[in-house]
């Protein structure tokens, strides 16, 4: 009888604690009109490109030249980036998890610490892991099965199951404590209703954007349109994954058992996702 390998739960929680007490970035970078928080491989570039296109139309400013992140940074950049358009809303984006004090009611309400509204973009963790592996498999140099087990210390991979669960856990707590300031968007819902959710994102940031500009931005964000706006100088040439198998097909029975055990033990909120696996032929 095969015995599953013990989960490195203690190492995971220790790494989360170290990160949670040492990452002051979001407490430091507070003076923005809105902050886009995105789980890695959740459609960050796509959402930023659509938002940037809509803002450019609304404000009569140059649209992003290419779909790559650098072009969208003109409107939604790293918190440390200088502001390019003074008349545009000041927006920033990051993949970061917040400091342990970030969701302190005493700090926010008792001491009156200003924090901007946040939009948190998440994705089914199983699909995000496949996407990350597809992008970085040459660099990782391991099988998907090995990659899936990850590194709870956060050193081996750019993103893995442990980093994904840490992100989901921390932002679930923030959303639970401050629901009015935190708007969570699932990638799958954004795919199904991009115009509706793009409008809600701007509304959450209290930014007025005309409906026709949102519609035009969604059209610009189609795969065909984005494929025509790839930067010829960029090494990134693909908009979609090389392997078009459904993400669930990457996981064999042993992988599914490991994933189920990890999320059951370590994930505190499922973010509305159904972790059951599709039945073959069903």
Can you say where each PLM-predicted feature lies in the sequence?
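PAPS-dependent sulfotransferase catalytic domain
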Residues: 1-184, 253-282
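Phosphate-binding beta-loop-alpha motif at adenosine-nucleotide cofactor sites
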Residues: 37, 178-205, 246-250
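Non-catalytic, well-ordered alpha-helical segments in soluble enzyme domains
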Residues: 55-60, 197-209
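Substrate-binding/catalytic groove segments of enzymes
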Residues: 207-211, 268-270
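PAPS-dependent sulfotransferase catalytic core
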Residues: 216-265
């Amino acid at each position: 009888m095969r015995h599953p390998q013990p989960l490195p739960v203690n190492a995971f929680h220790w790494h989360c604690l170290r990160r949670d007490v040492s990452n002051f970035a979001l407490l430091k970078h507070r003076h923005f009109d809105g902050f886009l928080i995105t789980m890695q491989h959740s459609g960050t570039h796509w959402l930023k490109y659509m938002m940037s296109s809509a803002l450019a139309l609304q404000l009569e400013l140059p649209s992003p030249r290419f779909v790559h992140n650098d072009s969208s940074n003109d409107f939604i950049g790293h918190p440390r980036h200088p502001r390019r358009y003074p008349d545009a809303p000041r927006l920033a984006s990051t993949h970061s998890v917040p400091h342990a004090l970030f969701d302190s009611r005493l700090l926010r309400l008792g001491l009156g610490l200003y924090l901007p509204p946040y939009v948190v973009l998440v994705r089914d963790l199983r699909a995000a892991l496949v996407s990350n592996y597809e992008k970085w498999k040459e660099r990782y140099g391991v099988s998907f099965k090995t990659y899936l087990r990850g590194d709870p210390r956060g050193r081996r991979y750019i993103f893995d199951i442990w980093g994904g669960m840490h992100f989901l856990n921390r932002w679930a707590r923030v959303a639970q404590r401050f629901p009015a300031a935190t708007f969570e968007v699932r990638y799958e819902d954004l795919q199904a209703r991009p115009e509706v959710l793009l409008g809600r994102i701007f509304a959450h940031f209290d930014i007025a954007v005309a409906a026709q500009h949102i519609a035009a931005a969604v059209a610009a964000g189609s795969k065909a349109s984005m494929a025509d706006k790839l930067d010829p100088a960029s090494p990134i040439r693909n908009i979609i994954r090389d392997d078009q198998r459904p993400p669930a097909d990457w996981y064999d029975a042993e992988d599914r058992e490991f994933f189920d055990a990890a999320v059951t033990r370590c994930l505190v909120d499922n973010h509305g996702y159904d972790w059951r696996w599709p039945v073959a032929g069903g």
